Amino acid sequence: MPEQSNDYRVVVFGAGGVGKSSLVLRFVKGTFRDTYIPTIEDTYRQVISCDKSVCTLQITDTTGSHQFPAMQRLSISKGHAFILVFSVTSKQSLEELGPIYKLIVQIKGSVEDIPVMLVGNKCDETQREVDTREAQAVAQEWKCAFMETSAKMNYNVKELFQELLTLETRRNMSLNIDGKRSGKQKRTDRVKGKCTLM
């Protein structure tokens, strides 16, 4: 499907095995898979409300491998918002996000007006290598938001994408999370007076 000019592009980065695909699939399809299948690059679409009209939230799930730097640079140049995922069970996965963050700053010039979320996934696991305060300190240094999630337990997954749109100050964004495409009437909640979950 070709990109539309009104697509809002979110790019998900992180090391292999941190749960990027699991977070995206949990959000878009409501499913979770236990088996690890490496991703080269997948794109998912979700209809959202944007500036009182309809646009498409396009989520690009990138490879955890460093074998495709040209794809990384292209994803960053086209991206409107970024989710940087690490596993709380792997300090190395947090450290590997540093060069990606620097590349985003290099390509975009500044991240002050760009929504960036640092996400500690697998927070349901007991064998942690990254303390919450440590990750919060990194997020503060990078001037980005931070959230812990569990794709497996469906903890903070919807909230992650809602918060990302809340951080978008250039447009008034609303997120349709109903994914079932049924004829049922959708309930609307106001979140922080700016974005709407439908």
From Swiss-Prot:
Biased composition range(s): Basic and acidic residues: 178-192
Residue span of region Disordered: 178-198
GO terms of molecular function: GDP binding; GTP binding; GTPase activity
UniProt-listed InterPro entries: P-loop_NTPase (IPR027417), Small_GTP-bd (IPR005225), Small_GTPase (IPR001806), Small_GTPase_Ras-type (IPR020849)
UniProt motif (Effector region) ranges: 36-44
Lipidated residue numbers (S-geranylgeranyl cysteine): C195
Entry keyword Lyase: no
GO biological process: signal transduction
Tissue-wise expression: Highly expressed in heart and brain.
Gene3D superfamilies attached to this UniProt entry: P-loop containing nucleotide triphosphate hydrolases
Propeptide regions on this chain: 196-198
Keywords: Cell membrane, GTP-binding, Lipoprotein, Membrane, Methylation, Nucleotide-binding, Prenylation
Function: Displays low GTPase activity and exists predominantly in the GTP-bound form.
Family: Belongs to the small GTPase superfamily. Di-Ras family.
The protein, known as: GTP-binding protein Di-Ras1
Record gene name: DIRAS1
